[in-house]
């Protein structure tokens, strides 16, 4: 046989002598398959499952520092209560867990601490975790969900002391040489919401209103709460002290002035601050400027 060759552009092809070249549709043999397997495509899973959503976490440490003399400035050392939110995470789409510590107490009076959750509802929420009283509960008589972490932060940080022992905890380098020497009291608030959207909203740090209670309710007088600037008191907090002493946030029906904001001083100062960072903020020591 004769080997036939031909070229197209710069390419060259050769045909074996036993191979015949025919015109279109003139071949005498028909090839049904090339491999013996007919590929009909992948029909896929008829009932595919949605992929699980990844867990969400916030690793910023939020340190809150409070002065307990509101509406007066007091010594304004901002170490009367130090609390940190160390971690927030959402698991199983709907469960928000907040973990933190009450780290230091420089107050000389009985002081409590709580968290008010804004722009969310407690309806249908399952609550678990750990606070001073045991398992956290939503406080009754509140429009917003409120959880009290402790009614006596001195006792929570140092359970061995008496209920009326208000010795400083981790703020005084002189008294026993104790300052910034431990984690204090741990707390955890876990809320399982009806929807993932509600859990994400509750995780927004702007919706987490940490506050202290510097004086308990007495008779018809509601308790004295101290919040960060422009956060309103809870339903159980007094409004009678707004506009008094160094406070200029006149949310008090007996006052004529109409300044806006809560817990703001006449000089624009605050009784509560929040410091976001990658680590716990180093709070001021006692008797130090």
Regions found by a protein language model. Give the residues of each.
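Extracellular distal adhesion/interaction modules in secreted or cell-surface proteins
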Residues: 1-289
């Amino acid at each position: 046989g004769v080997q036939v060759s031909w070229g197209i552009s710069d390419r060259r092809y050769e045909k074996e002598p036993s191979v015949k070249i025919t015109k279109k549709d003139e071949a005498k043999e028909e090839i049904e398959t090339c491999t013996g397997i007919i590929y009909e495509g992948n029909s896929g899973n008829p009932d595919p499952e949605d992929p699980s959503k990844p867990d969400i976490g916030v690793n910023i440490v939020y340190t809150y520092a409070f002065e307990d003399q509101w509406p007066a400035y007091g010594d304004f050392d901002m170490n009367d209560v130090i609390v940190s939110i160390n971690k927030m995470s959402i698991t199983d789409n709907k469960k928000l867990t907040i973990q933190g510590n009450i780290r230091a107490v420089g107050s000389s009076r009985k002081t409590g601490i709580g968290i008010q959750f804004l722009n969310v509802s407690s309806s249908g929420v399952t609550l678990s975790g750990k606070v001073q009283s045991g398992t956290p509960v939503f406080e009754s008589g509140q429009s917003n969900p409120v959880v009290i972490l402790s009614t006596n932060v001195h006792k929570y940080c140092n359970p061995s002391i008496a209920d009326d022992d208000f010795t400083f905890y981790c703020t005084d380098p002189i008294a026993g040489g104790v300052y910034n020497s431990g984690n204090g009291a741990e707390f955890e608030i876990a809320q399982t919401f009806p929807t993932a959207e509600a859990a994400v909203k509750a995780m927004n740090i702007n919706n987490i209103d940490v506050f202290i209670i510097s004086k308990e309710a007495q008779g018809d007088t509601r308790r004295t709460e101290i919040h960060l600037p422009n956060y309103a008191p809870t339903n159980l907090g007094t409004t009678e002290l707004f506009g008094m002493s160094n406070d200029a946030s006149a949310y008090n029906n007996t006052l004529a002035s109409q300044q806006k904001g809560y817990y703001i001083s006449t000089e624009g100062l605050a009784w509560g601050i929040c410091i976001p960072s990658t680590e716990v903020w180093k709070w001021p020591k006692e008797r130090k400027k």
